[in-house]
């Protein structure tokens, strides 16, 4: 009886969201109004290894099927990476590190040569500093990987919202 009421409650909640115009941001890019625009974004090369990882992750997210699409937009990103020692032992050696990555990005129309969106994203990851050099390399690389994923999610969300709002405005919806 309780399970039936719970199921009925969730069903009514889902139907009420449909009536208010709410749409899931990542439901299905293939049917979304911003799909063609998302696939038409070219990610400019980003220097350093962390930049290469971010560029590849963004390319895979913007065009998951890898279809050849005429490029109408370019996404330029500049990264600033800061590594800090947080915890310091009595001998003066760091025991905990923090990696801060700032991504200044802008989305530009290639044909009109105009900037459509210019924002900053920030990722903050921490890692252990160990006595073994190999372990340090692995933990710091893992922090870079986590930072790239955090930046990718944030940049994708912002670009997706931009294109969805633009498509809604073109269709005359609020």
PLM regions and their residue ranges:
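C-terminal/domain-edge helix-coil "capping" segments
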Residues: 138-174
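N-terminal export leaders
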Residues: 4-8
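Post-signal-peptide N-terminal segment of Sec-exported extracytoplasmic proteins
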Residues: 39-72
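Bacterial Sec signal peptide processing site at the extreme N-terminus
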Residues: 18-36
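Short beta-strands and strand-coil junctions in structured, solvent-facing domains, enriched
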Residues: 64-65, 84-86, 158, 162-165
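Surface-exposed short loop/turn segments
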Residues: 65-72, 76-120, 125-142, 146
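Bacterial N-terminal signal peptides
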Residues: 10-18
């Amino acid at each position: 009886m309780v399970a039936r009421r719970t199921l009925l409650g969730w069903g009514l909640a889902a139907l009420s969201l449909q009536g208010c115009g709410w749409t899931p941001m990542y439901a299905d890019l293939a049917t979304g109004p911003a799909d063609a625009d998302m696939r038409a974004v070219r990610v400019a090369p980003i220097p350093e290894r962390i930049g290469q990882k971010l560029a590849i992750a963004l390319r895979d997210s913007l065009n998951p099927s890898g279809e050849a699409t005429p490029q109408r937009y370019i996404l330029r990103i500049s990264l600033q990476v800061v590594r800090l020692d947080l915890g310091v032992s009595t001998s003066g050696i760091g025991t905990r590190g923090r990696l801060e990555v700032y991504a200044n990005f802008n989305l530009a129309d290639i044909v009109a040569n105009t900037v459509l969106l210019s924002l900053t994203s920030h990722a903050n990851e921490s890692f252990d500093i160990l006595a073994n050099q190999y372990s340090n390399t692995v933990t710091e690389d893992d922090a870079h990987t986590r930072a790239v994923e955090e930046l990718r999610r944030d940049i994708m969300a912002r670009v997706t919202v931009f294109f969805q709002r633009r498509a809604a405005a073109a269709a005359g919806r609020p």
